[in-house]
Each structure stands twice: as structure tokens, then as C-alpha cells.
Amino acid sequence: MDFALSDNQKNIIATFREFGESVFTPESVFQWRKDQGLPDEVVKGFVDRYFALDDQSPDGMGIMSQALILEELCRCAGAALPFQNDLFNLQIMGGFADETVSSRVLDDYRQTGRLMFSLGVSEPNAGSDTMSMTTSV
């Protein structure tokens, strides 16, 4: 098994390392915590970089590429929210939404940097308590 990163993955790391180091300064993170959110220009900067790389990638942004992005943002800022939720919600949407819905949501995300997404969970004997869910094989 080859665990070496591809040139594309190295480019993703470099791009988001530069973004994280330039944007997630201790002063900025402190202010955003006080404001209880990230400014529009920060989330839009993230989304612009994400989709620019996604458009260049032959296979698009898979879960491994998304994990590398989150790792870099955590390295710079100590956390990756809200981007972590956005990226994993994109994975869910890609797997289950029809093309019409998916395309509309992605277009809006590209334009605004804000992903309007919610995930409902309901399981027999657990309801929405995801920690109480059980599976069997």
C-alpha cells in the first residue's frame, strides 16, 4: 500500500496552510470567538480556494483531500469548524441528494460561502440520539 501524497494532495496542503496561516491569527480567532462566528470574507475565501482546487482535481475533492484540508486548518487554528461540518455535509449530499438539489446547494455555497444544510436522524429505539444507535450484521 502506498501512503505517499500525490502532487495534487501536496498542493491542497500548501494552499490551505497558506490560507490558515494568513487568516487564522490568534487575534482573529479571539475576535471571532467573541463575535460567535466567522466573517463572510473568511468563509468565502475558504470556499473560493476549495472549489478552485476541486475544479483542477481530476477526481474532485474526495474525503482524503477534505481530511488534509481540515488537518491544515486545525494545525493553524486549533479547530476547523464550521468547515469540517461543511465538507462532511458535502459528502453526505453527494451520496444521497439528487443532481437538481445538489447543484442548487453547491451553486449557493460557491456564491456565499455559507452552506445551508441540515441532517435529520431518526432510528428505531434511538430517535435522534445518535449515541444510542445500534447496528447488526
Q: What is each stretch, according to the model?
A:
Residues 32-35, 94, 122:
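Glycine- and other small-residue-rich loops at beta-strand/loop junctions that grip anionic moieties
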Residues 47-48, 97-98, 134:
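Short alpha-helix boundary/capping motifs
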Residues 78-91, 112-120:
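FAD-binding core of FAD-dependent oxidoreductases
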Residues 72, 95, 109:
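Conserved catalytic core of Hanks-type protein kinase domains
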